[in-house]
Structure formats: C-alpha cells, structure tokens
Regions:
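Hydrophobic membrane-insertion alpha-helices, especially the h-region
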Residues: 6-25
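Alpha-helical transmembrane signal-anchor/signal-peptide segments
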Residues: 24-48
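Beta-propeller fold detector
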Residues: 164-175, 221-229, 267-274, 315
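Short loop/turn segments that connect beta-strands within beta-propeller blades
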Residues: 216-217, 263
Length: 326
C-alpha cells in the first residue's frame, strides 16, 4: 500500500511538472515590454504616443514621427488635459470647429475597461437593485438582494434572510409580461452609491433576449430591447456615464461590439472583434472621438472611433507584447 502511494505521488508530481513547465519557461524568459501611452487626437488627426526611452526620457510623437513638447500635447489632447489647459488659461473656445467649454468636456469624458479576469470570475448569482428614482439626491443601497431562478426573480431581505414574496411576484409578473424567459443567463449592473444616477441592470434571459431592468419608485421597470435580425448577444455592460448618452454596451456571439443608446436603440461599432473572455478592452471617450485599446495575450491594437456614429477613423497596431496568458 505504501509503495502504491509513493508511485501515485511521483506520477502526480510528474504530471504537474509537465503541465507547468511550459508556463514556467515562458515566465522565466519573459522580457517585460511597456506599451506606450497612446491617444487619438481629433485636433491632429493622428495618434499621439508618449513613451519612455532607455534613459527614462519622455518622448511624444505621432505615427509619422513628428515630435511634440508636453505643452503641445496638452493642446493636441484638450479633452484629456482640460484641467491643465484651464489652469494655464489656454483652453480653446472651439475644438474641431465646435464651441465648447471645460464643463462640456468634463461632462462627456469617460473611461471604460473590461478584463478577462472579471468576466471569467465565479459569479455569486446575487444582485442588488437600487431605487433609481429616490426622493433623495444621494443614492442608497437597498435592504434586500435578488437572484434569478428557473421560475422567476426572488428578493431576499438581508436582515431576516427571508424571501419578500410580494416584491418577488411583482417583479416576476412584470418580467413575464414583457416576454422574459427564466432563468437569466447574464446580468450586468453597477450597484454602488458612488455614481450620479442608477440604471439598474441589463439582463439576458434564457433565450439570450436583452432586457433593461430597474426599480422606479418601488415598482419594476422592464424594457425589452429590440435586437437586429440574427444577432445573439453574449455579454452586456451597463455604463451609467455622466452624459447619459448610452445605456450600455453589448457583445454578440460573433464578437461584434454594439453601443446601446439611452433610448434602447443599438449601433454596431467599427471594432473588428472583441472576445471579453480572452481580450482586454479599454476606452477613453470624449465628445469628439473614442480611443479604443484592444489587448490580446500578445499584441495591442488601437482604434480611433468617431464619437457620433462609432465609425472607424484610424487604427494602429503594436505587435510586440510578451506576457503570460491572462
């Protein structure tokens, strides 16, 4: 018996070594590469790249090789450096032919990030639905949590750990009335008081139909969002940006990236393909353009999108990154 245990132990160790050796080799031979900070400038019509050299000196240049000072970059990226330009009294009256103020810029600026580790992390299946039309200025966390079951939605009072039957029936009936099929297969919300307003959740039902769910004055608000013919959504993201222009984002089964407008209409973006389970996505948005950084396990791709119709303005590829698979 002891001999068998030793043999089993050594076999297990050997299997683990074979499994881990490729990763260990990749990790030990990894050469760290810092991706330069890259932003699209609608003022310049090109990407502005900021990078440290071997002597730790900053270089600022565009894709054509033209170099710039920090003060010039401030003016080329007024949405990013709005505070600096305002402090220096250099903020322009117009940008790209449009009259703007620092307040306009700050209202429409936003950042968004999606990483595979968050997408692939185990989900508890418990959510918090805030009151979206509170009489108070500040948002407040609810006293209950909810979950989706095969038959409906259940609200659980956290103090007593008991199901609120009346509220559960109220919300379940409304969801069924709007055509929702239980159970839900994906839900995205942002239950925090550190935001300007609450839009509840974007939810995919058992048939991958898209719904908007929130609580307004204690009652359910449910809206079925119409999808283009043949589109099967797989991931949704609630946004809740200050401008209130968008409700969220959606990625379909073919990895197409859609913008969900505040009225529920969908616009397909020019991004060529994004798999949230494998790729990292970062968006720096303003009222003129979006700088979208799509990172795979090896490469970085930058896309400049028009902030009006999300069409492609310019793209840039950085094929040089070496990192362990996330």
């Amino acid at each position: 018996m002891i001999r068998f245990s030793k043999i089993f132990f050594y076999i297990t160790v050997a299997v683990l070594l074979v499994w881990q050796l490729p990763w260990c080799y990749a990790f030990l031979t990894l050469k760290p590469v810092k991706t330069p900070f890259t932003m699209y400038s609608s003022v310049l019509g090109d990407f502005v790249i900021t990078q440290l050299d071997e002597n730790k000196q900053l270089h600022r240049y565009d894709t054509k090789g033209n170099t710039y000072t920090q003060q010039q970059v401030d003016s080329l990226l007024p949405s990013l450096y709005v505070r600096q330009l305002t402090a220096d009294e250099r903020f322009p009256d117009t940008i790209c032919g449009k009259a703007v103020s620092p307040k306009d810029i700050q209202l429409t600026n936003f950042t968004f990030k999606s990483v595979p580790s968050a997408i692939n992390a185990p989900q508890t299946g418990l959510y918090f639905l805030m009151e979206s039309m509170s009489k108070r200025v500040d948002l407040k966390m609810p006293e209950d949590a909810f979950r989706f079951t095969d038959k409906g939605i259940e609200f659980i009072r956290m103090e007593t750990n008991c199901i609120d039957e009346a509220k559960s029936k109220l919300f379940t009936d409304m969801l069924v009335q709007k055509g929702f099929a239980f159970p839900a297969c994906y839900a995205s919300g942002n239950p925090t008081t550190r935001k300007d307003y609450d839009e509840g959740y974007l939810v995919l039902d058992a048939n991958h139909k898209l719904f908007h769910l929130k609580c307004t004055k204690g009652r359910p608000y449910v809206k079925a969002i119409q999808l283009p013919e043949g589109v099967l959504p797989e991931y949704v993201f609630i946004t809740e940006f200050r401008s209130r222009r968008t409700l969220g984002y959606m990625v379909d089964s073919k990895h197409h990236f859609y913008i969900i407008n505040s009225d529920g209409s969908l616009v397909k973006s020019a991004l060529p393909g994004f798999d949230p389970a494998k790729d990292e996505l970062t968006i720096f948005g303003n009222m003129f353009d979006w700088t979208v950084k799509l990172s795979t396990d090896k490469d970085d791709y930058y896309y400049a999108l028009d902030a009006t119709d999300y069409s492609l303005i310019k793209e840039l590829s950085l094929i040089h990154i070496s990192e362990p698979t996330r």
